[in-house]
UniProtKB/Swiss-Prot annotation:
Its cofactor is a divalent metal cation. This is dTTP/UTP pyrophosphatase. CDD domains: Maf. It comes from Hyphomonas neptunium (strain ATCC 15444). Pfam families: Maf (PF02545). GO terms for biological process: nucleotide metabolic process. One of its GO terms (molecular function) is dTTP diphosphatase activity. Its EC number is 3.6.1.9. SUPFAM superfamilies: ITPase-like (SSF52972).
Amino acid sequence: MPGSAPLILASASPRRLELLAQIGIVPDRVAPTDIDETRRKAESPRELALRLAREKAAACDAEGAFVLAADTVVALGQRNLEKAADETEAADFLRLLSGRAHQCITGVAVRAPSGQIVSRAVLARVKMKRLTEAEIAAYVASGDWKGKAGGYGIQGAAGGFVTAINGSYTAIVGLPLYETKSLLEGLGYRR
């Protein structure tokens, strides 16, 4: 159906923009939202990812448009590994993940022009090889960890640390494409 309402991406992530382009979706505008991303008491990583995606979609000022928002949480058990604040924290995160399996949960939410919000959480399990201190130091020095949940980006050099994935690769990168396309189309969005 030509003439679909515009699509706003409520995210500053260049990776999400690149992922959307892979499936032929180019947002009409990028408008990151600023919300409180503090984890609530007893909130699971899945609940956190979903809530943040929904709140970002709701907070975007885009009347009459579709709004797409997402949030990725890296969890080791019930511990969230957010975006590393500095090189020391990035190295600490990599030491924690070294030789272990962890979860990447991406919550994706779409707000229709009517205001209706639909959302889904997509979970992937990632296993990392045991990392040497030299590998950790080199990766941290590269700066590739900046702005990435868990202090690493699977689509870059850290992809060489991953021994197994169970689930959606694009959810690990930051936007599960199959689920995103399904949510958009389910609400009537057409390119």
